[in-house]
Amino acid sequence: MSERLSEETRGPLLGPLFANGWAMVDGRDAIAKTFAFDNFVEAMGWMMRVAIWAEKWNHHPEWSNVYGKVAVVLTTHDVDGLSALDAKLARKMDSLC
């Protein structure tokens, strides 16, 4: 099971993500980002590639795809906040774009 990020680990793990467009979600210990694609099909293809990793790591995003824009929220429900798995999946999502 994952552990909630400590204050000491937040900066090193989340700082690079914030520099790449991720942001904290108001009122939650979660991060969010919207990915834009040329069309719905490209967005779905990206979501399928991400889904393979999410399933492999047993860590699933909250997300929606509307007209080629995929809104993503990452948090770890088991720890009621952010964990290293959220940072790992966020990095993977960025790399698959």
Curated annotation (Swiss-Prot):
Its EC number is 4.2.1.96. GO terms for biological process: tetrahydrobiopterin biosynthetic process. It catalyses: (4aS,6R)-4a-hydroxy-L-erythro-5,6,7,8-tetrahydrobiopterin = (6R)-L-erythro-6,7-dihydrobiopterin + H2O. InterPro entries: PCD_sf, Pterin_deHydtase. Keywords: Lyase. GO terms for molecular function: 4-alpha-hydroxytetrahydrobiopterin dehydratase activity. The keyword Metal-binding does not apply. The keyword Nucleotidyltransferase does not apply. It holds the Pfam family Pterin_4a. It is an enzyme of class 4 (lyase). Belongs to the pterin-4-alpha-carbinolamine dehydratase family. This is Putative pterin-4-alpha-carbinolamine dehydratase. It comes from Ruegeria pomeroyi (strain ATCC 700808 / DSM 15171 / DSS-3) (Silicibacter pomeroyi).
